[in-house]
Amino acid sequence: MILSPSLLSADFSRLADELAALEAAGISWLHLDIMDGAFVPNITFGQPVIQSLRQRSSQLFFDVHLMIEEPARYLEAFRDAGADMLVIHAEADRHPQRTLSEIRRLGMKAGLAFNPGTDIAPLRWLAPDLDMVLIMSVNPGFSGQKFIPQSFDKIRATRTMLNAAGAGDWRERAKLARVLTAGADVLVSGSAFFGHPPYDRCHQRFQAAARTAADNAHDARCAAAALWQPGRALKK
């Protein structure tokens, strides 16, 4: 299981120290939520912050979640800033196949996200052009929302289509075990990680939960579930 802490829950007054602490704790992925205030209500950060983070860390895998309209306009800019993977939203792109293909042509991993009310049927046609699927288990834009229980069925359905799975940013106890049981291999966690230092011990708790799938393993917060495409190399 790979743990990908969400930067939004980090201390923005000391990001360089946060990155160093993540690497010291054995973290290999960093989840970066990009919001534009249009596709979702909030505004977060953009390429300059990612570029600054990349200058501080050449080892972390930057998992960049684009919650923005017309993401195809910014692919090269995010690549140049240091993104390793770009995840676009099915609802925000009129031509997702073209955009996913372009992301991969630019040398990055390509992911596709689906909001809670969006059907995953297009995966039948888009799967060859992507590396990962992100199933949102809350409506995007705000942290701390209640996990939508129907998401479990959606995760299982997507796993059936892709035969690989991962997970996002959690809220309630016992959710972690159920998502792991469904086949999760990437957990994205915000305040459940950054709010429970020291990071090395928190990382160990998540790893223990992955091994045992115990209902009380960790009080994680889940906002999404990412499913990896079979046959594609998973960066660890």
Where are these regions (language model features)?
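Hydrophobic faces of well-ordered beta-strands that scaffold small-molecule active sites
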Residues: 2-6, 30-32, 53, 62-66, ...
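Glycine-rich phosphate-binding active-site loops on the catalytic face of alpha/beta enzymes
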Residues: 88-94, 134-144, 182-203
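Alpha-helix-loop-beta-strand connector modules within alpha/beta enzyme cores
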Residues: 43-64, 102-111, 151-167, 206-215
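Glycine-rich, proline-tolerant flexible connector loops at the mouths of alpha/beta enzymes
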Residues: 31-47, 138-146
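Conserved, mostly hydrophobic/aromatic
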Residues: 15, 22, 33, 78, ...
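C-terminal helical cap(s) of enzyme catalytic domains, especially alpha/beta-barrels
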Residues: 195-222, 226-231
